[in-house]
A protein has these predicted regions:
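Acidic, polar-rich low-complexity tracts and alpha-helical solenoid repeat scaffolds
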Residues: 1-242
Length: 242
């Protein structure tokens, strides 16, 4: 007769096994169970019963579980804590990328507040600055461009609103900011057109004509470029010189 299974004592799982179990639950989509399993690793670490590597791995995986559940605030907290403690960890670049994406995936439509877009931009900049050799750096650069595009679009949207509300000076301030800070974005043609209209409104015809000429020449392939040319011709000032 063999030993009574109920009396058998198995050794406790190793730190690596505990983390692997949480990782497996995460991979199968059982995020709540993964968080529960991995949280035990963190607790054991606080009790001095778990190595720091296991703690770091569990910390990231908990953040990843929250990320996949779109629980952005909790994911951000985990990722920020990881980066603050382990900025040179072998997966620190991935954690930084996930942190940036936690903001990026929350970006609002153009007409709404773009604070989250700015935060995403800041975190992607940190990614490419601190981890330039990362496999995620290329996508980080692409996301930087998209964030800048969205912020520039919002500035133009606000400028257009100010102009339609009879506040050309506020509109000018926004439009000139776009030309200065976001010169490589796709909103430049629209910005030039609107700034020309602001100048016409304020009686600065020569400045308006110069902007429309630039628009019709440099961006003739765009709809705004074609509209700029039409506006220039209809103004009767096409031959005006400054």
């Amino acid at each position: 007769k063999g030993p009574d299974p109920s009396r058998l004592r198995f050794p406790p799982p190793t730190p690596a096994q505990r983390v692997a179990a949480g990782d497996m639950l995460l991979r199968t989509g059982d995020h709540d169970a993964a968080i529960n399993q991995l949280s035990k690793v963190l607790e054991l670490f606080r009790q001095g019963q778990m190595p720091e590597q296991a703690y770091a791995d569990a910390s990231f995986l908990i953040g990843e579980a929250y990320f996949r559940e779109s629980e952005w605030d909790k994911a951000i907290k985990e990722f920020e804590t990881f980066i603050s403690f382990y900025p040179r960890h072998q997966i620190a670049d991935l954690v930084q990328y996930r942190l940036a994406m936690s903001y990026y995936d929350q970006m609002k439509p153009v007409e709404q507040d773009q604070a989250l877009t700015q935060r995403a931009l800041d975190q992607f900049k940190r990614l490419v600055k601190d981890y330039p050799q990362s496999r995620y750096a290329t996508d980080g650069l692409a996301k930087i461009d998209k964030c800048r595009e969205r912020i520039a679009q919002k500035e133009v949207w606000v400028a257009n609103y100010y102009f339609t509300q009879g506040n050309p000076s506020a509109a000018r301030q926004r439009l000139e900011l776009v030309l200065k800070e976001y010169p490589r974005t796709g909103v430049i043609p629209e910005t030039l057109f609107l700034l020309a209209e602001v100048n016409f409104y304020e009686g600065k015809n020569a400045e308006a004509v110069e902007l429309l000429r630039r628009l019709s020449v440099d961006y003739d392939f765009t709809e705004w470029g074609r509209r700029g040319k039409q506006r220039l011709n209809s103004s009767g000032l096409a031959g005006t010189k400054r």
